[in-house]
Each structure stands twice: as structure tokens, then as C-alpha cells.
Swiss-Prot record:
<feature type="binding site">
    <location>
        <position position="146"/>
    </location>
    <ligand>
        <name>Zn(2+)</name>
    </ligand>
</feature>
<feature type="binding site">
    <location>
        <position position="149"/>
    </location>
    <ligand>
        <name>Zn(2+)</name>
    </ligand>
</feature>
<feature type="binding site">
    <location>
        <begin position="17"/>
        <end position="24"/>
    </location>
    <ligand>
        <name>ATP</name>
    </ligand>
</feature>
<dbReference type="GO" id="GO:0071897">
    <property type="term" value="P:DNA biosynthetic process"/>
</dbReference>
<dbReference type="GO" id="GO:0004797">
    <property type="term" value="F:thymidine kinase activity"/>
</dbReference>
<keyword id="KW-0862">Zinc</keyword>
<keyword id="KW-0547">Nucleotide-binding</keyword>
<feature type="binding site">
    <location>
        <position position="121"/>
    </location>
    <ligand>
        <name>substrate</name>
    </ligand>
</feature>
<keyword id="KW-0843">Virulence</keyword>
<dbReference type="InterPro" id="IPR001267">
    <property type="entry name" value="Thymidine_kinase"/>
</dbReference>
<protein>
    <recommendedName>
        <fullName>Thymidine kinase</fullName>
        <ecNumber>2.7.1.21</ecNumber>
    </recommendedName>
</protein>
<comment type="similarity">
    <text>Belongs to the thymidine kinase family.</text>
</comment>
<dbReference type="InterPro" id="IPR020633">
    <property type="entry name" value="Thymidine_kinase_CS"/>
</dbReference>
<keyword id="KW-0418">Kinase</keyword>
<feature type="binding site">
    <location>
        <position position="179"/>
    </location>
    <ligand>
        <name>Zn(2+)</name>
    </ligand>
</feature>
<keyword id="KW-0237">DNA synthesis</keyword>
<dbReference type="InterPro" id="IPR027417">
    <property type="entry name" value="P-loop_NTPase"/>
</dbReference>
Amino acid sequence: MNIIRKLKPGTISLVLGPMFAGKTTFLIHCIYMLERLEKKVVFIKSTKNTRDKTIKTHSGIQLRPKQCKIIESTQLSDVGSLTDIHAVVVDEAHFFDDLIKCRTWAEEEKIIILAGLNASFEQKMFPPIVRIFPYCSWVKYIGRTCMKCNQHNACFNVRKNADKTLILAGGSELYVTCCNNCLKNTFIKQLQPIKY
């Protein structure tokens, strides 16, 4: 189904998945489609993501927008006025404590597209994602293959080091995504017991 039919003014769309699944690639695709429809788009990136100063995926795909305005911010409430904007695209949405601000933009008839992790390295959902979820009119899950066994769907993000900081930006040097079997059989030793 054509994604553009789902992206309507006044709606919030959410793309979730583990690291390295292609969420940012999906956002870049949406931006290009919106630009072809002559929509003014703003791309919001968290300053907590210190990996790269450009809009670039883990696989090296880089955003080269025609008109898209790129904003780096710690909080969405610091973004300022978006009166002339048709669509707001937020990458790494789990980094924004005030993600619920997107409701205000949706009420202003903006198209909202969010992408974020399905869970932390502790296998817990991020509170900002939990708070915005009920207001999303469309949710897409993007998966990937386990980086350990290459056989099963990976839905878990596992940190390779013992750092317990909740937000620690990084790529494959710090994280691996794995399936349930590999989580239990290989990585569970570095995690505390998972509580549901």
C-alpha cells in the first residue's frame, strides 16, 4: 500500500523497530515523497544523537532534501513556530521527553511522522513512545534479521558494554540487535532479569 495515503494532515504516524532496521531510511523516503507533492517539511533530530551531524542512516544513506528544513534540538518545545510547515518528521523520537508536543502540531493540521526504537537495551519501552502511542493513527513496525544467528527476526537491542546509562548514542560499535533465542542464550548474562 502506498504510504502517502496514510500521511494525512492532523495525523501522527509512528515507525518503531530495533536499531539498524531502516527506520531513518523510511523517514528519508517519506520526506522525498512529501517534497514531490510540494509539501514543506521539517526534519527534527535530537542533539543527544552525537553520532553524526548530518542526516545519515547506519547503512550510509544520507538525506539530501530539496526544501526540507533540518533542526537539531534537545526538546521539541524549543523548535519554535512551524506555521508555514506542512509536515514534521522526528527521528530518534524516543530521545524527546516532550514527544507529546506532536499532538499540538497534529491539531494544527500538520502531518507528523515519528521514528524511534521499540525498546531500550534493557528491553523496556521508552516513556515518550508510550505517551504518544495512543494518539497515533498509524503504526509501522520495521524489523531486521538477528545480528548473532542471522536466522530469526531481531527485536531486541543489546548494548555490548556494561554502561547502564539509558541514553547512549552509538552504532554497531556499541549495540547489536538480536532475536529472542540469542538474547536468552548469549546476551542475557549482561542484562539484569527482565521484568514485564
